[in-house]
Curated annotation (Swiss-Prot):
Similarity comment: family membership: Belongs to the heat shock protein 70 family.
Modified residues (Phosphothreonine): T173
Domain of life of the native organism: Bacteria
Organism, as annotated: Streptococcus agalactiae serotype V (strain ATCC BAA-611 / 2603 V/R)
Protein's recorded name: Chaperone protein DnaK
NCBIfam families: PRK00290.1, prok_dnaK
A matching Pfam family: HSP70
Ranges of Basic and acidic residues composition bias in the record: 596-609
SUPFAM superfamilies, per database record: Actin-like ATPase domain, Heat shock protein 70kD (HSP70), C-terminal subdomain, Heat shock protein 70kD (HSP70), peptide-binding domain
Keyword presence, Chaperone: yes
Region (Disordered): 578-609
Keywords recorded for this protein, A-Z: ATP-binding, Chaperone, Nucleotide-binding, Phosphoprotein, Stress response
The protein's role, per its UniProt record: Acts as a chaperone.
Signal peptide: none
């Protein structure tokens, strides 16, 4: 069975890992980095992903960042003169990760385990699956990020029982999961979180502070200047990272804008104390989900054995201190917060292929599921933190006499009223025989699969008529749209491969021209005029082809030059070899001559005493 890669598709950074033997290994990207910025930019018809896209974000308005925050919504982003769904942009990131994983493995990759925040709802999970499909990946499993982290942490600890709290603060989302580990079983007891809290929010606090201070000093609002705003974002992210290691950092942005008197520069120092003050409310928001998860799991703090920190934002000192204060425990630092999720996803891939034995993952649904009933009430069928996969049925009836149909409004959330929860979908069960209210028996069944994706059916127990719906992400992507996006993604991959081939050919041409010119110079006056002239002629032809930019012509002329240059190099080698042989012959003769002038050799005799 081919390898199943593990992908952590993050808000700010993504990572890909693979199982090698029993070890989960992070695959470095083409720039040698173990994580890849989740950034996509468009330039001259080319799609650029990762580090290169992030570097040009300041100057290129066609750059998309933090697309994960829009997953599961119908919101689109404009770039490159087109509108893209969040799934399409995410697919470009996935395709890039898939591409360099294939380069590393030396084989095609068709399957992946992709992680999502534990608190992602059904629409967001479905959108992630769609993104994988567009990227040409069969998504074998959607795994919650804290669960994947626990899997990576606990793989070598299957011989002991422990309860762990995973505190996962990423670029755009926050999750807390409590798991029980023992005998190879990873059992999620409870999960809680906030899909609108992450490192981006900490950056935004710094940006708002810088904008406000600059406006006070110069009367100019930098938030209205798109390019200045991108520079501020980069500076804020850097300052945040700096303040994890030092107590004060300098923010210096020359020529940030221009005033009536000329160019203006932003120079400001930011202390850790000020940063902590700016972000105090964000840190406070992490405490409620911790308490909620503990309460749902029915555990006290004293029963938690380890606290695992996941996500780059857990490096913020104030966050670490808040975790210590809230749990009364020193966080376990045995895992890399940026890499552990992808590594856990790769381990789950190994479980699916059978390469990892005796490991069972029992995950939960993060939010309650149910339907709208009379009076706009939300009636739960499946409570949050129920182990998945699961199925649950309940019988309802009509609200009016002779009601011919019932509308099934499927919801996800925790609020008592339907209007306050997330709509997953609606469908109708029709042709209900005329009867007084309360008589027809309508059985509603919810199914949640191992990926946390929901399907619902309604059945009239009197007529056995049934209606079924698989909840689609409310981005509204049909199978046809996904297929079209897949074809577009494949076409882009082919175009990218062709562009790479062009660049490689041009580099080869440059190299061949340089090497041949060097050889021609070195062979001047050495008597290889025929070969030198042939090489020079082929070199001139290649230079003409290079100027024309005709790739086929360049390829043909490069082959011709390589042939002539090789013939010249052979002559040069033969001459060097002959000279070396002659020199060795002369040394041998001289050595023999000096030996003949020495004393004659005489056999000696000796007598034992």
């Amino acid at each position: 069975m081919s390898k199943i890669i593990g992908i952590d598709l993050g808000t700010t950074n993504s990572a890909v890992a693979v199982l090698e033997g029993t070890e989960s290994k992070i695959i470095a990207n083409p720039e040698g980095n173990r994580t890849t910025p989740s950034v996509v930019s468009f330039k001259n018809g080319e799609i650029i992903v990762g580090d290169a896209a992030k570097r040009q974000a300041v100057t290129n308005p066609d750059t998309v960042i933090s697309i994960k925050s829009k997953m599961g919504t119908s919101e689109k982003v404009s770039a490159n003169g087109k509108e893209y769904t969040p799934q399409e942009i995410s697919a470009m990131i996935l395709q890039y990760l898939k591409g360099y994983a294939e380069d590393y493995l030396g084989e095609k990759v068709e399957k992946a385990v992709i992680t999502v925040p534990a608190y992602f709802n059904d629409a967001q999970r479905q959108a992630t699956k769609d993104a994988g499909k567009i990227a040409g990946l069969e998504v074998e499993r959607i795994v919650n990020e804290p669960t994947a982290a626990a899997l990576a942490y606990g793989m070598d600890k299957t011989d002991k029982d422990e309860k762990i709290l995973v505190f996962d603060l990423g670029g755009g989302t926050f999750d807390v999961s409590i798991l029980e580990l023992g005998d190879g079983v990873f059992d999620v007891l409870a999960t809680a979180g906030d899909n609108k809290l992450g490192g981006d929010d900490f950056d935004q606090k710094i940006i708002d502070f810088l904008v406000e201070e600059f406006k006070k000093e110069n009367g100019i609002d930098l938030s209205q200047d798109k390019m200045a705003l991108q520079r501020l974002k980069d500076a804020a992210e850097k300052a945040k990272k700096d303040l994890s290691g030092v107590t004060q950092t300098q923010i210096s942005l020359p020529f940030i804008t221009a005033g009536s008197a000329g160019p203006l520069h932003l120079e400001m120092s930011l202390s850790r104390a000020k940063f902590d003050d700016l972000t105090r409310d964000l840190v406070e928001r992490t405490k409620t989900p911790v308490r909620q998860a503990l309460s749902d799991a029915g555990l006290s703090l004293s029963e938690i054995d380890e606290v695992i920190l996941v996500g780059g934002s857990t490096r913020i000192p104030a966050v670490v201190e808040a975790v210590k204060a809230e749990t009364g425990k020193e966080p376990n630092k045995s895992v890399n917060p940026d890499e552990v999720v992808a590594m856990g996803a790769a381990i789950q891939g190994g479980v699916i292929t059978g390469d990892v034995k005796d490991v069972v993952l029992l995950d939960v649904t993060p939010l309650s599921l149910g339907i709208e009933t009379m009076g706009g009430v939300f009636t739960k069928l499946i409570d949050r933190n129920t182990t998945i996969p699961t199925s649950k049925s309940q019988v309802f009836s009509t609200a009016a006499d002779n009601q011919p149909a019932v509308d099934i409004h499927v919801l996800q959330g925790e609020r008592p009223m339907a209007a306050d929860n997330k709509t997953l979908g609606r469908f109708q069960l029709t042709d209900i025989p005329a009867a007084p209210r309360g008589i027809p028996q309508i059985e509603v069944t919810f199914d949640i699969d191992k990926n946390g994706i929901v399907s619902v059916k309604a059945k009239d127990l009197g007529t056995q008529k049934e209606q079924h719906i698989v909840i689609q992400s409310n981005s509204g992507l049909t199978d046809e749209e996904i297929d079209k996006m897949m074809k577009d993604a494949e076409a882009n991959a082919e175009a990218d491969a062709k562009r790479k081939e062009e660049v490689d050919l041009k580099n080869e041409v440059d190299q061949a021209i340089f090497a041949t010119e060097k050889t021609i110079k070195e062979t001047e006056g050495k008597g290889f005029d025929t070969e030198r002239d042939a090489a020079q002629s082929a070199l001139d032809e290649l230079k003409k082809a290079q100027e024309s930019g005709n790739l086929d012509d360049m390829k043909a002329k490069l082959e011709a030059l390589n042939e002539k240059a090789q013939a010249l190099a052979v002559k040069l080698y033969e001459q060097a070899a002959a000279a070396q042989q002659a020199a060795q012959g002369a040394e041998g003769a001289q050595s023999a001559d000096s030996s003949s002038k020495g004393d004659d050799v005489v056999d000696g005799e000796f007598t034992e005493k």
